[in-house]
């Protein structure tokens, strides 16, 4: 009754809410895209800097953000297409208000397409997170170029090993999930609070990032992430004796 009497107000609130959710989602995606390179930089260079990597990898982070937005729109479009196909198949049953062969066919076809689509999304997400983003970080390239390099040099011809990597990370993830759940229970759910959980489970996050980087490093010297660098000024100390003072800062 209230909606009928105040339809214009309801429509305004609804549209405003949708726009707000979209803006929050875009902001979260942007921060996540920039944050991925900050995390990689912190792990590779063994430092806790924020300002430097935020500015240094601005181009790569923004490129990843735009790439993520486009992919998100394609995912939404594909999902809508699958839903539309299912509705068209079931249309005879919908019009006759019965559940028969058309309805069953719609469920089978729609379910199969959706399952394949979900598996494709998982594989794509793994490729971007494990191979493409580190490639962008190391080669200092934008998203599309990072995609091409990662596809041609890291995935093509090595699909089997990449699948094994994903399976291994999945199994390790199950173990990490058990540890995280146990920790949350032991701390009476305090460990599940946003900031506390980020700090508490940071070693797990770092482990999985390092695991992926170590896999990539097997592809040759051009894919070396963990170089012998000075922990204070990040001077490249390759070829120098271990334990010697840094020629740049003297520490």
Please describe what each predicted stretch is:
Residues 1-17:
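Interfacial loop/helix-cap signal at membrane boundaries in integral membrane proteins
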Residues 17, 21, 25, 60-84, ...:
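Hydrophobic alpha-helical transmembrane segments in multi-pass membrane proteins
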Residues 239-243:
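Short, non-ligating residues that shape and space the ligands of small metal-coordination modules
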């Amino acid at each position: 009754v209230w909606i009928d009497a105040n339809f214009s107000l309801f429509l305004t609130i609804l549209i405003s809410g949708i726009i707000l959710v979209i803006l929050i989602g875009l902001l979260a995606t942007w921060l996540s895209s920039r944050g991925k390179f900050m995390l990689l930089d912190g792990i590779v260079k063994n430092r806790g800097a924020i300002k430097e990597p935020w500015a240094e990898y601005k181009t790569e982070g923004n490129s990843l953000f735009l790439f993520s937005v486009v992919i998100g729109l394609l995912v939404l479009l594909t999902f809508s297409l699958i839903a539309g196909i299912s509705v068209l198949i079931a249309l005879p049953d919908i019009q006759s208000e019965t559940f028969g062969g058309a309805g069953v066919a719609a469920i089978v076809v729609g379910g199969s397409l959706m399952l394949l689509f979900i598996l494709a999304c998982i594989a794509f997400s793994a490729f971007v997170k494990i191979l493409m983003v580190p490639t962008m970080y190391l080669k200092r390239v934008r998203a599309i170029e990072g995609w091409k390099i990662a596809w041609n040099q890291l995935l093509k011809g090595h699909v089997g090993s990449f699948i094994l990597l994903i399976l291994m990370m999945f199994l390790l993830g199950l173990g990490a999930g058990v540890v995280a759940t146990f920790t949350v229970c032991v701390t009476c759910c305090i460990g599940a609070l946003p900031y506390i959980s980020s700090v508490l489970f940071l070693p797990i996050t770092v482990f999985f990032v390092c695991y992926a980087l170590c896999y990539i490093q097997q592809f040759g010297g051009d894919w070396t992430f963990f170089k012998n660098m000075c922990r204070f000024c990040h001077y490249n100390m390759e070829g120098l004796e271990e334990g010697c003072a840094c020629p740049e800062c003297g520490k």
